[in-house]
Structures are given as structure tokens and as C-alpha cells.
Amino acid sequence: MPIKILMPALSPTMTEGNLARWLKKEGDKVNPGEVIAEIETDKATMEVEAVDEGILAKIVIPQNSQNVPVNSLIAVLSEEGEEKTDIDAFIAKNNSVSPSPKTDANLPKPHENIANVEEQVTVIKHDVSRIFASPLAKRLAKMRNIRFESVKGSGPHGRIVKQDILSYTPSTAHNKIVSRNPEEYRLVPNNNIRKIIAKRLLESKQTVPHFYLSIECNVDKLLDIREDINKFFSEDKSTRISVNDFIILAVAKALQEVPNANASWGEDAIRYYNNVDISVAVAIENGLVTPIVKNANQKNILELSREMKALIKKAKDNKLTPEEFQGGGFTISNLGMYGIKNFNAIINPPQSCIMGVGASAKRAIVKNDQITIATIMDVTLSADHRVVDGAVGAEFLVAFKKFIESPVLMLI
């Protein structure tokens, strides 16, 4: 008897997804646990494993199909010897969803441009045998290279006056529409991840009252400790500590001290989190994902570093599970490696805070009334004012600065 392969729900909130790719073709033998397809969710590409054994008799939903509802029929397995008519009858009985192949229908076609629209021009004819204009209007027209034939006078008997020249704008009807050569650009359809990013960040900027606080941190001691740790573990590359690892740990410790910054907004109540779960923004080919370091405040720097490396690798390979990127109470976005000094990040709802981290650089500072050189890192907190008041945001940044500038406090 034919066996249904259904669109899986990869998270409790998932209602539909994109069937990105089939890894098996019709007629192939399929074993339990074997990866047969890839499903694109709003944050990652997930593998679909076969549960049953059989022959992949029919692919109902082709690859590159969008918005496939959960639990809809995407393929059929059959046993040896089953007839094609039986398979077709089984599909007709069980399939109520039509595939939605990915298309560029909403994108402009390369050869469609506004130059193809018939140009309609209204020509206004004037009697130019004699033009009446004031001397000042004539001087202004000459200075501005304006032809009197194009100007309608508002003075007595149509006389052109100063104000007519000052208020004159060329008719748009005579401006030739310039078309772009379709070879000057390329069209890339928006994948599901990009659409979700656009939707969520637009919603955030439109509905969340952002405010921003910045602070400077001296990272000289942190860099010294990092160098000592990496020298000690020089033979084991997997334990190499990054500055970002220290930043994550410092945020975790600061949230432990200022728990009111570890919260999210709800219409009826503010949710304060007991766990310190930190989302870390990671750039991938298709956009951005935020894998989560859970209970970050309970981990030492080596544990946190190893876990972060594993999460980044899975993110780059599109192998994150929903549990690894859904949730989190606070986000870190670090653009320091690109030389960015500071920036205001957009809050990732329903979280109430995101911290943008800039590059470390040598600067002149005043210490004990003396000018000296220090390595300074700028960080900017974007906070939801419905949840986090200015004083709470300031307390958090002060606590973060304390741990960054005295890193030994994070290690004991």
C-alpha cells in the first residue's frame, strides 16, 4: 500500500514552509533515517528524513515550491510491484494541495520598463510673434535659460512678470523617459528567510519605541587575558577564545546583575526571563540568523567559546534546529570585525534589547590627569522603552563595562 510523505512541522509555530530541494528522485530506493529533502523555514534550511522504507514513487510537490502547508502531501512511497494506477488513485484521494512553485511573478520582467508605455504629450501653442514681459522678468529668464514661449504670463494681457519666472518649472510632459538596459541589473527572488527578516524588522521599527544608549569600554586587560588563554591552549585550536566570546559572557553576567533588562513586552504583562539565553547575530549567505547560547551565565569562557563555534558552523551550513535559533531574551550584533565604530541595531521582537558592538581601536584618553593610549570599544544598546527604562538600560551598560574592563570578574 502506498505511504504518504507529509510536509513536516519543524517547530510548534510553523504553519507552512518552502520545499527547497529533493535529494532523491522518483524511482529511488529510500531507507528509514535517510535524508530525502530540504525544507526552508523562516530562519534555516532543515533536512527531512524518511520514516519508512520503500520506493519514491511520486514527487507531488516539486522542489523550489513556496508556502507549502504543514501536513500536506509532498510525495508518495510505494512497495515493490505496486501499479502506477494505484499510486495515481492514492494521490488523487489524499492530495488536496496544489504545489506553489517559486516564481518571479511579482518581480518586474527584464524587458518590461516604463519606456514601453506610450508617451502622451500635450503641446501648448503660444502666439510667439510678440511676447510681453517686464524688464526684470527678461533678465531673470536669461539668467535661468528659460524660453518665454514656455511661460504663461499672469500680468495684464498675459504679460510675463518676475513671479512667473520665479515659479516656472519645466513641464514633465516634455521630459523624455529614459529606460534602463535590462543587462544593467539582475533579479534575485527573495527567499523565505529574506522575507521574514524584512517583515519582522519593518514591524520592529514601526511598532517598537526604540531608544539608544552608548558607552565606551577599555579592552586592554581583556585582550591581555585573551592572549594568555590562547597561548596556554595554543596546541588546541578548538579552544581559541575570541573577543566576541568575552562579550557574550560579559552580557550574560550583566543580565544576571540587571535582570530587568532580560525581558520582553506583552500586551497584558511584561515577561521577565529566569534564564539568560543570548541570541548572537550570524551573517549567512541568505541573510541573518541568531543562534542562541542558552544559560550563558552558567558557562565558563571555554564552554561558551566551544558552543558558539559549533553554533556558527551549523548556521553557516544551514543546519540549525528550531530549538537553536528560536527564543532568546537578548541579542548581540557585532560588526567590529568590519571596522564599524558604532551603530544602532534594530530590536528583534519580542526581545526588548539588542546591543551593537563596534570595532576596538587605539585612542587617546585621560587617566589620572595624564593623556595615555588605550584600546577602546564602543557599544550601543537599542532598547524597547515599553519594557526598559533609561535608568535600567544605563545600569546594564555600566555592569557590562565593569565585566569587560575587569575580565577576571567573569572568570572566577
From Swiss-Prot:
Matching CDD domains: lipoyl_domain
GO molecular-function terms, A-Z: dihydrolipoyllysine-residue acetyltransferase activity
Domain Lipoyl-binding: 2-78
PROSITE patterns according to UniProt: BIOTINYL_LIPOYL, LIPOYL, PSBD
One Pfam entry name: 2-oxoacid_dh
GO biological process, one term: pyruvate decarboxylation to acetyl-CoA
Superkingdom as given in the UniProt entry: Bacteria
Cofactor binding note from Swiss-Prot or TrEMBL: Binds 1 lipoyl cofactor covalently.
Task of the protein: The pyruvate dehydrogenase complex catalyzes the overall conversion of pyruvate to acetyl-CoA and CO(2). It contains multiple copies of three enzymatic components: pyruvate dehydrogenase (E1), dihydrolipoamide acetyltransferase (E2) and lipoamide dehydrogenase (E3).
PANTHER family, alphabetized: DIHYDROLIPOAMIDE ACETYL/SUCCINYL-TRANSFERASE-RELATED, DIHYDROLIPOYLLYSINE-RESIDUE ACETYLTRANSFERASE COMPONENT OF PYRUVATE DEHYDROGENASE COMPLEX, MITOCHONDRIAL-RELATED
Protein name, per record: Dihydrolipoyllysine-residue acetyltransferase component of pyruvate dehydrogenase complex
Native organism: Rickettsia conorii (strain ATCC VR-613 / Malish 7)
